[in-house]
Amino acid sequence: MAKEIIYRLSNPGYTIYHRAALGGLAATVRAWGTNRPEGVEAELQRDFVRLAWNDDLPDQEALRRILAASFRLTDDKMIELPGQGIRADQADLRLAIHNGICGTFLQHNKMRPGEKEPRRVEVRSADDEVGEMFTYKAVNSFAHQKAQGTGLLEDKLKGNWPEFASIPQSVVPGAMSGALELEASPEEVILLLFLTVGCAIFLLRPRTYQDKAQYCVVVPDIIDLQAYARAIQRIATAGTTIKRFSNTYLGRVVGGAEEAALRFLIDLHAGDLTSERSVTGCLAVAMGKVSWDANQINRSFIVKLKGEYPELGIFQAANQYLGKTRIIKSKKGEGYAIPASPVPELVAANLAAERHWCANFKSLVGDKKDFERMKFSQGGLRAMKKAIKDADDQAIIRSFQEAWKRTMAALGERARRDGLDFGRLIEVERERTRNAILRTKTAEALASWFLRFCADATKGAALAAIREDAQRIQKFIFNQRNFDRFQNLCLFALVSYASDESNSANGGNQ
């Protein structure tokens, strides 16, 4: 073989974008199997990918064959990336990826010319017999199929590559060229074409709607090409023993960029029986309209996430039980998906920012209506509680809920004695307790309320949970630096116990 390109994961000049693109190339080579582009050799190892061809095959023709085998269209004119391993019957997942790519890598019509009238695909949740119709723009071709904007396949080069090639926005979404075009070697630009394969794209539906981000491109930091190629193709599978969270359209709809990244990382590692991970973490690139450019989608913010967090189990529980998506109708009568709960978004953002997992939880229950909705979050809050590792958090929640249980018992006795509505008594007491927690402004005030709440529940006797962790609890609750955390934990303890009640009433259905 006269022409040979070796892309090494250890290349010191590579950024996380290069490594993600190399992961996309690795997954594509794996998908080729023995059906490689004619005249092209391909080799995949843990730390490199090798491409080669003979002198009798011009470089431009070799590239055309590589692109033709890597970037395709389905019969329904949706983008097809063989490297991601999406099956023909997964139209809803392909729809999410198609719309995501068109909104990020290929946001300009000239990069994906196609039909003017949108086509429709039915999307339904696991619980729905009939779904809603979601739309997409069918494309006749897209930029990656012919390396559009790079200059690699210009006729004037007569079969050869240029000395330098351009890096258009379709290759690296959000890339800004400024006065001068971004350029690199032909080999590097060819590699970056596979960034769209190596990344995962999610559709963002922020809870506050103040954040105008619409998409999230998750860029993995890859350390093992073979493992990553296997993992990214495994995500598209629908196994019965291993739960996947991002292998459907609805699974690609999340509240925040951090939630998207953690959901993708969990899916990457699911079912991997080896001790070695394929990635060390990722970048979550949120994209949307920004104030200084209303004409196109730009990067609105970027956050780096690690592969592991001490309390990642709490997010996993929130993601599994509260990470569902609801389908509503837009003003045009089309389907529109939104997250059913804001909790996974909040926990993911906290973990990524190295905040306490429960930080700002009070923003989710500060309004009475939000609080009432939260208490019916099925088994999700209970599962989160069981996943907590921190001893201080466990002690506070355990003590609060023991006191609340005794308070309920006293209210039950009162209801029986006086012929009152037990449910109404609980509702009033729960709301009174929520307001009392929210009104406290200092650690001392909250600690005093907490101790009085516990004492009232036992008519002056010490709670068993407090006796067991007396020193730990005392040290924690009187520390002013713990005030926000303490307040959020009390609110979480209240609503997660309320979740126990609602599940009991519903027969424990989750």
Give residue ranges: language-model regions.
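Domain-exit/linker segments immediately C-terminal to small folded modules
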Residues: 167-347
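Long amphipathic alpha-helical coiled-coil/heptad-repeat bundle
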Residues: 138-144, 150-190, 461, 472-487, ...
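Long, contiguous all-alpha helical interaction modules
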Residues: 1-112, 116, 125-128, 277-510
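A broad "ordered helical/assembly scaffold" signature
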Residues: 166, 193, 396-400
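Long Lys/Arg-rich low-complexity intrinsically disordered regions in nucleic-acid-associated proteins
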Residues: 88, 92-146, 153, 168-173, ...
